[in-house]
Curated annotation (Swiss-Prot):
Organism: Bartonella bacilliformis (strain ATCC 35685 / KC583 / Herrer 020/F12,63)
Tree of life domain: Bacteria
Protein's name in the database: ATP synthase subunit alpha
Residues annotated as signal peptide: none
Sites annotated Required for activity: 372
Coiled coil listed as a keyword: no
GO molecular function, one term: proton-transporting ATP synthase activity, rotational mechanism
Length: 511
């Protein structure tokens, strides 16, 4: 073996020359106590509020309480392997998550890690989860419809792009079903190759404290119906630690803001915020923050307001993007006056109130039209819908009032009887099976038939059959009429004449 001293000395000189004396510094602290997902850490004197820290076993946490002699850290994971005396390292970054189109069709946890077994995300961008909401200047008032495909909502409680509309009701009243149908209703806009990017709405579903089986079922329905391709699922299930349930809505919101700030449109459903409030209460009490009403901390209102204020419609100078929020709140025994429901009602731009009684009567979606309201109103409707839906809300309100009195008196005059008959048929018309969202122009035609007396002669049980037959006829023989309503966005006298002729002919032959 030939050893050349000159070569060896040359290599050694190179290595000595390139020797780097810089060491990697990181500020570390020690765990004083740990339990219930909270660690008290000593020694992290310069840590920021909301900064990520890493424990010696690789689990991450977030510094929430900055006290004189220690730091309260919430742990994003199991605290079983963390012991007193373990080292904790500052990571120097505030909590952030991956964002961008790479997340579409994926299921991620509250920190943006994939949990669907489909491999890494390869996202090119990251965003902080807790950022300031857009100010007044970049915003624009809500004026574009955000179609849900549900007649009861699109006609009576319209939602616009950039609005925050609360879905509130007891357990098992169909709150998640409304979110699911709204997601499915965006499918035609994504399938339409000729449609512009402005018509597409990307959907984000944040599951907070749900059963894993429920989330899996939601994902399965989206996948089967081809809606997962434009959706992101953020899941912090019931078995996840409270800090994960607390941060999941903020993470989902950051993912939606990516689309909003790039001139696109996104819709986010938080299911549900009452469980996030419970998780936040648990963390706050364990961090020894003073409790307030119902033992919630004093800043639980701020928790929800800063989250929901991030839903906005931006003006043209800022890209005209939008983020629409559909927060869900679960009530106990229809008590809307509890702490969290009243908080979120006061933050949002209206609420869709679902009632158990209506649900069991077979009125589904079980929307209480009297208590539900949209504070954006007809600004979020196309003119055609305004033309037909303007009278329906008043008629239904009168019907409910009369129906209450009619229980006591049997001899009713003809006009009252007519009002009750019309109301019963309109209520029947607003029923809609799950997974069958309707296009806006189809809703307009069916409601037009209802408010113009075409249902009055029918038995209430025939209303659904009449509607299905009418829509089948229009789709097969008169698609150009539906297309005209969709493109012109109003019912002109010419279209009205054609529609009346079709309805007259159909009603005459209907049996």
């Amino acid at each position: 073996m030939d050893i050349r001293p000159s070569e060896i000395s040359k290599i050694l000189k190179e290595q000595i020359k390139n020797f780097d004396q810089e060491a990697e510094f990181s500020e570390i602290g020690w765990v004083l106590s740990v339990g219930d997902g909270i660690a008290r850490v000593y020694g992290l004197d310069n840590v920021q509020a909301g900064e990520m820290v890493s424990f010696s076993n690789g689990v991450q946490g977030m510094a929430l309480n900055l006290e004189m002699d220690n730091v309260g850290v919430v742990i994003f994971g199991s605290d079983r392997d963390i012991r007193e005396g373990d080292t904790v390292k500052r990571l120097g970054s505030i909590v952030d998550v991956p964002v961008g189109p790479e997340l579409l069709g994926r299921v991620v946890d509250a920190l943006g890690n994939p949990i669907d077994g489909k491999g890494p995300l390869n996202a090119k961008n990251r965003r902080r989860v807790d950022v300031k909401a857009p100010g007044i200047i970049p915003r624009q008032s809500v004026h574009e419809p955000m179609s849900t495909g549900l007649k009861a909502i699109d006609a009576l409680i319209p939602i616009g792009r950039g609005q925050r509309e609360l879905v509130i009701g007891d357990r098992q009243t169909g709150k998640t079903a409304i979110l699911l149908d709204t997601f499915l209703n965006q499918k035609p806009f994504h399938e339409n190759e000729a449609g512009s990017d402005q018509d597409k709405v990307y959907c984000i579903y944040v599951a907070i404290g749900q059963k894993r089986s429920t989330v899996a079922q939601f994902v399965k329905v989206l996948e089967e119906r081809g809606a997962l391709d434009y959706s992101i699922i953020v899941a912090a299930t019931a078995s996840d630690p409270a800090p994960m349930q607390f941060i999941a809505p903020l993470a989902g919101c950051a993912m939606g803001e990516y689309f909003r700030d790039n001139g696109q449109h996104a819709l986010i459903g938080y299911d549900d915020l009452s469980k996030q409030a419970v998780a936040y209460r648990q963390m706050s009490l364990l961090l020894r923050r003073p409790p307030g009403r119902e033992a919630y901390p004093g800043d639980v209102f701020y928790l929800h307001s800063r989250l929901l204020e991030r839903a906005a419609k931006l003006n043209a100078d800022n890209g005209s993007g939008s983020l629409t929020a559909l927060p869900v709140i679960e009530t106990q025994a229809n008590d809307v006056s509890a702490y969290i429901p009243t908080n979120v009602i006061s933050i949002t731009d209206g609420q869709i109130f679902l009632e158990t009684n209506l649900f069991y009567q077979g009125i589904r979606p079980a929307v209480n039209v009297g208590l539900s309201v949209s504070r954006v109103g007809s600004a979020a409707q196309i003119k055609a819908m305004k033309q037909v839906a303007g009278s329906i809300k008043g008629e239904l309100a009168q019907y409910r009032e009369m129906a209450a009195f009619a229980q006591f008196g049997s001899d009713l005059d003809a006009s009252t009887q007519r009002l009750l008959n019309r109301g019963a048929r309109l209520t029947e018309l607003l029923k809609q099976p799950q997974f069958s969202p309707l296009k806006t122009e189809e809703q307009v035609v069916t409601i037009f038939a209802g408010v113009n007396g075409y249902l009055d002669a029918l038995a209430v049980s025939d209303v659904g059959r009449f509607e299905r037959g009418l829509l089948a006829l229009l789709r097969s023989d008169h698609q150009e009429l539906l297309n005209a309503i969709a493109s012109q966005k109003q019912i002109t006298d010419e279209l009205k004449g054609k529609l009346v002729a079709i309805l007259d002919r159909y009603a005459k032959n209907f049996s």
